[in-house]
């Protein structure tokens, strides 16, 4: 449901590992714990993120940073407290995000008919 295609990055051969994409999608859509590396990036704890990242993620850490800063919902990032609130769907923040994505996907499908 999340479009990971970023033309300028893919043209340079830079793309997030599928496992990382999956972890972020599961976190954003279902509230699942994203794991040490992704959670650290979302919390803006970059020292921990570098320590937790495997070799593939170290090569593309700036790709994830860029996606988070440009595309991730503001309420799902910035601190470990924000991550907990997102996972707990406090105030329906995650539910609202998912509904918005679903509506956008439906409108895109309808506009191509």
Predicted regions and their residues:
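Intrinsically disordered, low-complexity, mixed-charge
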Residues: 7-8, 71
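Long, charge-patterned amphipathic interaction tracts in eukaryotic proteins
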Residues: 3, 35-36, 88-91
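Amphipathic alpha-helical interaction modules
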Residues: 14-61
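Amphipathic alpha-helical binding modules
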Residues: 60-113
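Short, mixed-charge, low-aromatic patches
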Residues: 1-6, 18-21
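Compositionally biased, low-complexity repeat tracts
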Residues: 9, 27, 31-32, 88, ...
């Amino acid at each position: 449901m999340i479009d990971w295609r970023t033309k300028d990055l893919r043209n340079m051969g830079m793309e997030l590992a599928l496992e990382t994409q999956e972890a972020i999608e599961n976190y954003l859509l279902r509230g699942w714990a994203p794991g040490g590396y992704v959670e650290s990036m979302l919390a803006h704890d970059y020292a921990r993120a570098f320590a937790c990242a495997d070799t593939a993620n170290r090569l593309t850490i700036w790709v994830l940073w860029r996606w988070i800063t440009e595309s991730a919902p503001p309420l799902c990032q910035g601190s470990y407290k924000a991550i907990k609130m997102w996972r707990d769907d406090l105030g329906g923040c995650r539910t609202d995000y998912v509904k918005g994505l679903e509506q956008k996907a439906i409108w895109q499908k309808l506009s191509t008919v």
